[in-house]
């Protein structure tokens, strides 16, 4: 069971939190779900060049959006585009928008995936990429990186993965992060999956 289900979904009520929080009636659930997906798509499209760790969307009488970034320099890049972005978002729900930036310096699974994808696009060796990223994250209890597809242009798709430490997929109480993404190369699409076993007090 633990190996089939998404590790974040498996631990949602135990030690993880929802990144979408809506204060509304049950009949408006479908409408707010569509708005939530649309807002996240606009955020990704506008801030494509920035590595956002998390996106929190809180809908009440106002719309509150918390963007978690890892570097203060990233905020300086997007500072000039914030007015246009807030205007686009306010037209969707017709609510006042509160935009908060949270500087999150703790490395998470999405940051690792972002680094792996950048190195793949730079045409580095797959085994070298995995080895370097695992060595960077050896302070955690465990880290597993898997890359699948036509690796380095081979004719038959395969998986390349490596693990340092341990990844307890079946134990719900542990703080386990998971992230998956895809990247387009000249040989096709490569899938990247990251499992990260962190200390319980880290977010």
From Swiss-Prot:
Highest taxon above the source species: Bacteria
A Pfam entry, by short name: Ribosomal_S3_C
Cellular component GO terms held in the UniProt record: cytosolic small ribosomal subunit
InterPro entries, alphabetized: KH_sf_prok-type (IPR009019), Ribosomal_S3_C_sf (IPR036419), Ribosomal_uS3_bac-typ (IPR005704), Ribosomal_uS3_C (IPR001351), Ribosomal_uS3_CS (IPR018280)
GO biological process, one term: translation
Protein family per UniProt: Belongs to the universal ribosomal protein uS3 family.
Quaternary data: Part of the 30S ribosomal subunit. Forms a tight complex with proteins S10 and S14.
Descriptive protein name: Small ribosomal subunit protein uS3
Species name: Carsonella ruddii (strain PV)
